[in-house]
Each structure stands twice: as C-alpha cells, then as structure tokens.
Swiss-Prot record:
Location of the protein in the cell: Secreted
InterPro entries, per database record: Chorion_S16 (IPR008450)
Highest taxon above the source species: Eukaryota
Keywords: Secreted, Signal
Any one annotated GO CC term: egg chorion
Designated name of the protein: Chorion protein S16
Pfam families hit by this protein: Chorion_S16
Keyword Signal: yes
Protein family according to the UniProt entry: Belongs to the chorion protein S16 family.
Protein source organism: Drosophila subobscura (Fruit fly)
C-alpha cells in the first residue's frame, strides 16, 4: 500500500470510530442521579410523521377557513340559536396551527359559506344564506 492510501484508510477509520463513540449512549453514573434517554428510530420516525401530518392538516384547514365568509357563518349560528362567534384574525396558518388539537382537520366548508368574489351594493358584502345546510365546519379527530 502506498502512503497516501494508508493515510486515507487511517482517516476513514478514525472518522468511523469517532462516529460510533459519539452516538453511543453513556450509562455511567457519576455521583449524581443521571439517566440517559435512549431514542429509538421508530419512535422518532413516528413523531416526525405525526408532526408533518399535523402541520399539513393545519395548513389545509387554515386555507379552507381563510376562504370562509365569517359574517355568514356567524349569522347562520345566530339563526340556529348557537352563536359561533367566529372572527377573522387575518391569515390563520400560525394561529390555527397553534390551537389545533393533534390530527384534527376541517373536513369541508359548505359552499354556502365560502367568500363571494362579487360585492353587494356599493362594494358591500352580498350574502345569500341557505338555511337548509346542516354543517358549516366539521372537525375530525
């Protein structure tokens, strides 16, 4: 073997050993009550998948809620005797993601409650409410 190949082999061996030593859990106890959490790859992968699922659900739900007509939703709630008191807080991505229970999603917004691109008289909102609609927003767990 040439000297360069030997140096390369030693360098790779040193990197390999340092990687093994760095990721090995330490079970020594030095006077204090210390413990080591052993992280399993399956638990980490499941937690990452759950976080991605929750984030995707929150983003999709926020996009659906951003397209809702809040005035129509509140008026429908008052007509049914159960005020919703929904308020538009601007883009709901961060706000809704923070308040969203894990793995909950807004299933569908009734087309009646979607924003209209056409305004009423003098640019006001024109809302036509179909009181036969039974569900405005449905949350799944």
């Amino acid at each position: 073997m040439s000297a360069n190949n030997m140096r390369l082999l030693c360098l790779l061996l040193a990197c390999y050993i340092s990687a093994i030593v760095a990721h090995r859990p330490s079970y020594r106890s030095s006077g204090s009550d210390r413990y080591v959490d052993v992280v399993r790859a399956s638990e980490t992968a499941e937690a990452q998948a759950a976080a991605l699922t929750n984030a995707a659900g929150a983003a999709a739900s926020a996009a659906k809620l951003d397209g809702a007509d809040w005035y129509a939703l509140n008026r429908y709630g008052w007509e049914q005797g159960r005020p919703l008191l929904a308020k538009p807080y601007g883009p709901l991505d961060n706000l809704y993601a923070a308040a969203l229970p894990p793995r909950s999603f807004v299933a569908e917004i009734d087309p009646v409650f979607k924003k209209s691109h056409y305004g009423g008289a003098y640019g006001g909102k024109s809302v036509t409410l179909n009181t036969g609609a039974k569900v405005a927003v449905a949350a799944l767990n």
